[in-house]
Design a protein with these regions (language model features):
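Membrane-cytosol interface motif
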Residues: 1-9
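P-loop NTP-binding module
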Residues: 8-11, 18-19, 23-251
């Protein structure tokens, strides 16, 4: 699986809601997103619908997806970010937005006008957003609805890039369902904490071709630790417990 980007560790003061890319910022992390923008264009030049997923929660895919969206936007591209995680609404939480109308209401037929779903400048003035909406009882079934395909087709007419911030691939089926509309899958791995027991599963996803043009972005890269032999694949920080928010108590 190709590794197309490496995002350095953030400052302690910068949370998952941080936007670290701007025209005036030239530090290592901002430059890493610019390089990611270039490298993604190199490996899949025609890709316009980019899906972000991960192994489990806590990898930083929402942070990476929103900052890549900004990196693309400041290069002159029209970009929209969709929160396709109908279970946890991560992008909504990060932006401090509590909209009842969103992707879930559109897919369920409660809303038929895409224009009313789009929020302008929620976390950056040059990036539009469609938030998840109310939490539905049947997220996977909603995402299988052909209305989702129709929405993506409509957005393709308006935007150069459509960024989908999705659920972790090994937690629920939603990511595999959404992948049918994507051109490129960006699999985010947080450096130093991936449990090695997941590596065969990751390779299986790649070999089975469930995710189109699957590639890896290494997030929170610990440069100093790597000098001493640590880093990617070394830790066991997750165990099998990072599924909070994706299953109900009954499940």
């Amino acid at each position: 699986i190709p590794i197309v980007g490496e995002i350095p560790a953030r400052k302690d003061s910068e949370g998952d809601d941080a936007i670290v890319v701007s025209d005036s910022r030239n530090d290592r992390i901002s430059e890493a997103f610019r390089m990611l923008r270039v490298d993604l264009n190199f490996i899949a030049k025609e890709a316009r619908v980019l899906m972000f997923t991960s192994t489990l929660s806590g990898e930083g895919k929402s942070f990476v997806s929103r900052n890549l969206a900004v990196a693309l936007a400041i290069s002159g591209k029209k970009v929209i970010l969709l929160d396709t995680d109908l279970r946890k609404h991560t992008q909504s939480k990060l932006a401090g937005v509590n909209r009842k109308e969103g992707l879930s209401t559109y897919l369920s037929g409660l809303n038929s006008n895409p224009d009313t779903l789009i929020t302008v400048g929620a976390f950056h003035p040059q990036v539009d957003t469609i938030f998840a909406g109310i939490i539905p009882p049947n997220p996977a079934e909603l995402l299988m609805n052909e209305r989702f395909d129709q929405l993506i087709d409509e957005l393709k007419k308006r935007y150069d890039y459509i960024i989908l911030d999705n659920v972790p691939a090994l937690v629920v089926a939603d990511a595999a369902i959404v992948s049918r509309v994507t051109d490129l899958t960006i699999y985010v791995i947080r450096d130093g904490v991936l449990d090695r027991r997941y590596l065969p599963e990751l390779e299986r996803l790649h070999q089975d071709g469930k995710f189109k043009n699957m590639c890896i972005v290494l997030n929170d890269s610990q440069v100093e630790k790597k000098k001493y032999g640590y880093g990617y694949g070394q830790g066991y920080g997750y165990g099998y417990g990072h599924v909070n928010g994706y299953y109900s108590e009954k499940e």
